[in-house]
């Protein structure tokens, strides 16, 4: 029987025999009675097994992480911390872990645990993080399914750079960079975004989304950057920026509400161990009406803050500034005191595909800023005018021949389209309170780090 089932059905199992296979978390010997803490991975909560010290020599030898089979009875323990326990009749040591098993009961640093990423999910902290990650991924699929979105698998290998930043990993079978003789007959790279392909499918299905790995060869050794991460990228035809904003708000609230309902114990653990006040922060997001501020208004607010004596690391605030985390957090934490959408950014600091506004200075872009981290989501309405799109590609030196298929979507009946990108790891960091992206992805890929 799974330990999860015992917790769910314990009242109906009283004094009944159960058989459990589990992993030893701790094994404490007493004079007459000994205590073994077990978990089999099916539940966050550990199960206490009580056995007589005399006559259970095999059980006494079981080290941390060893596998045991327990046959015993479920008994109530109202006077103790746990509601019930299993009193063992038989304990069989199935497989003994080595004495110097790397994860002993003592506290380990996150830096050390990153070096043993293949084992760290067995700790309570990473068990909670990865349970929440799994639940959040399911919630995303469920949200879009309920809204009748079509899930598409955008390609991992591509010849397009959707961001135009040139920070892509090359995919090649050659050492001489002669791409015409390469596998695809041209230069290929790992995808930095599935958005362009999602736009094409949105013209067929109206509402689509991608959810898959993306790659950036950006040599950034920060707590927020990884070379491989997952992105959620919805795209909706016939939608404008206002529709996009509503979809972002609905999705973020849905995911957080799902975690509150289905992973409350893990959330409480993260609140205790990773970020004090985490639950209050998340409650603020899921219960708030998100605010909307234009980029121009945000610049004026920041200018006034500098005049009033507020210290920013970047205090030269002018139109055209690419807002930093300190500016984003000031807007949503100090001014609006709520999650905030900032809209209509200068076109020079945004991607080529964003719809140009009538002022010819800004584009119909939106970023969602949340208390604690700043930007969580970035999106836009897409440029629907073919001539404007071609002109913008040329202005930012994007090869229009490479993107002919994408640009030509505007020639086949194209009336509005909008979408956004949400970095999944950044979302998991926000929900769990983890402070480093390396701690929310099972096997992190960062500069000079390819351990597994």
From Swiss-Prot:
One of its GO terms (biological process) is asparaginyl-tRNA aminoacylation. It comes from the Bacteria. It is found in: Cytoplasm. Its EC number is 6.1.1.22. The keyword Aminoacyl-tRNA synthetase applies. It catalyses: tRNA(Asn) + L-asparagine + ATP = L-asparaginyl-tRNA(Asn) + AMP + diphosphate + H(+). GO terms for cellular component: cytoplasm. The keyword Nucleotidyltransferase does not apply. CDD domains: AsxRS_core, EcAsnRS_like_N. Its main location: cytoplasm. GO terms for molecular function: asparagine-tRNA ligase activity; ATP binding; nucleic acid binding. Keywords: Aminoacyl-tRNA synthetase, ATP-binding, Cytoplasm, Ligase, Nucleotide-binding, Protein biosynthesis. NCBIfam families: asnS, PRK03932.1. PANTHER family: ASPARAGINE--TRNA LIGASE, MITOCHONDRIAL-RELATED, ASPARTYL/LYSYL-TRNA SYNTHETASE. Homodimer. Belongs to the class-II aminoacyl-tRNA synthetase family. This is Asparagine--tRNA ligase. It comes from Mycoplasma mycoides subsp. mycoides SC (strain CCUG 32753 / NCTC 10114 / PG1).
